[in-house]
Swiss-Prot record:
Any single biological process term in GO: D-alanine biosynthetic process
Catalysed reactions, as listed in the record: L-alanine = D-alanine
Enzyme category, top tier: isomerase
GO molecular function: alanine racemase activity; pyridoxal phosphate binding
Species whose genome carries this gene: Clostridium acetobutylicum (strain ATCC 824 / DSM 792 / JCM 1419 / IAM 19013 / LMG 5710 / NBRC 13948 / NRRL B-527 / VKM B-1787 / 2291 / W)
Gene that specifies this protein: alr1
Active site: K38 (proton acceptor), Y267 (proton acceptor)
Disulfide bonds: none
Protein name per its UniProtKB record: Alanine racemase 1
Gene Ontology cellular component annotations, sorted alphabetically: cytosol
Pathway(s) of this molecule: Amino-acid biosynthesis; D-alanine biosynthesis; D-alanine from L-alanine: step 1/1
Keywords, alphabetical: Isomerase, Pyridoxal phosphate
Length: 386
């Protein structure tokens, strides 16, 4: 238990981040690697994770929104940072001030960026988004879109730094749709080349493609979930890339009580003691990202043993049954998500229980939970968001 933070924390292993990045660097055939650190590095803390990525093989970073990019710049990150999504024109001053590379998917938008850059007498670098099969932002791969991008290339104070797309099903065994997307991407790029449009980097290789599709490793690849030690699905060949999970969510036992047969635990009386039971309370709940959907289904690791989560998970607390566990004490450390010795209960396990993906599970861990950064087995930093 740490003295200056509440007894719920997420340990982030910086050595494992470095290891994963090095493994990805070896796997990727691209000269450049764009480390995706959107959503606060998938809940791991972008300001603290980004430097480790850059020290171990990443050349660039990608975020989803302008505030994420600004936070990185203010922390001292100087490498190219691109925004994968939309930025309102009302925030264009921040794009300019912090030298951010903006995604573009319409001529009108690019024209306004060009005008803003011209007024400031600077040059903006942009990335062209191409929708090859996701059905979200991006130019469609048509002759009309080729002409639109050609017009963008002629705008003043604008450099097309990159062109990119995103695979919809590259993490599935059947790669037919993925190859169809790749074909559209290559066609569009070749049409641009015919018009002598200079583009420095192409990037379409996401986590699954980095692992299984070397033909998608153009000038850059764009790893996301694999940076954080998880695979994009159970259908990818995990032998292609050895990864180490980075986050371990922990807490401490804060209360222990004996309950009699017939007594209930938590809201809704969903758990009834069928025997004399020893129940421990943990100070973690769904406001911390420990979703209520895990109620009565999850387990935790305590003193080398599993203990079931019983009753409904509350906003700030939950209960576990420790009746069959030896000598649990108030203050004992509990692993909610992660590994301890030979036991583990991971984001993959949680995702399977609640019917989602590991991405969502790790992104759910809220900023009410302090991040404790570990290097060489020692705490090197504690970040309290609130």
């Amino acid at each position: 238990m740490f003295r200056h933070i509440r007894p719920v924390w997420a340990e982030i292993d910086l050595d494992n981040i470095a290891y994963n990045m090095q493994q990805i660097r070896r796997c990727s055939k691209s000269d450049e690697i764009i480390g995706v650190v959107k959503a606060d590095a998938y809940g791991h803390g972008a300001v603290d994770v980004a430097p480790v990525l850059l020290e171990n093989g990443a050349n660039r970073l990608a975020v989803a929104v302008i505030s994420e990019a600004v936070e990185l710049r203010k922390s001292g990150i100087q490498c190219p940072i691109m925004i994968l999504g939309y930025t309102p024109l009302s925030l264009v001053d921040s794009i300019i001030k912090y030298s951010i590379e903006q995604t573009v998917f319409s001529y009108d938008y690019a024209e306004k960026l060009s005008e803003a850059a011209r007024q400031k007498n600077i040059t903006l670098r942009i990335h062209i988004a191409l929708d090859t099969g996701m059905g979200r932002i991006g130019f469609l791969p048509t002759e009309e879109s080729v002409w639109e991008v050609y017009k963008i290339s002629k705008l003043s104070n604008i450099i097309i730094e990159g062109i990119f797309s995103h695979f919809s099903t590259s993490d599935e065994t059947n790669k037919e749709y993925t190859y169809a997307q790749l074909k559209k991407f290559e066609w569009f790029y070749n049409e641009l080349r015919k018009k002598n449009i200079k583009i420095n980097i192409r990037h379409i290789g996401n986590s699954a493609a980095i692992m299984e599709l070397p033909e998608t490793h153009f000038e850059a690849t764009r790893p996301g979930i694999i940076l954080y030690g998880y695979y994009p699905s159970n259908e990818v060949d995990k032998n292609k890339l050895n990864l180490k999970p980075i986050m371990t969510l922990k807490t401490n036992v804060v209360h222990i009580k004996k309950m009699m047969p017939g007594e209930y635990v938590s809201y809704g009386r969903k758990f009834k003691c069928e025997r004399e039971s020893i129940i421990a309370t943990l100070p973690v709940g769904y406001a911390d990202g420990y979703t209520r959907m895990l109620s009565g289904k999850a387990k935790v690791i305590i003193n080398g043993n599993y203990a079931p989560v019983i009753g409904r998970i509350c906003m700030d607390q939950c209960m576990i049954d420790i009746t069959d566990l030896p000598s649990v004490q108030v203050g004992d450390e509990v692993v909610i998500m992660g590994e301890s010795d030979d036991k583990k209960f991971t984001a993959d396990d949680m995702a399977e229980i609640i019917g989602t993906i590991n991405y969502e599970v790790i992104c759910m861990i809220s900023k009410r939970v302090p991040r404790v950064y570990i290097k060489n087995g020692e705490v090197v930093k504690i970040r309290n968001y609130v």
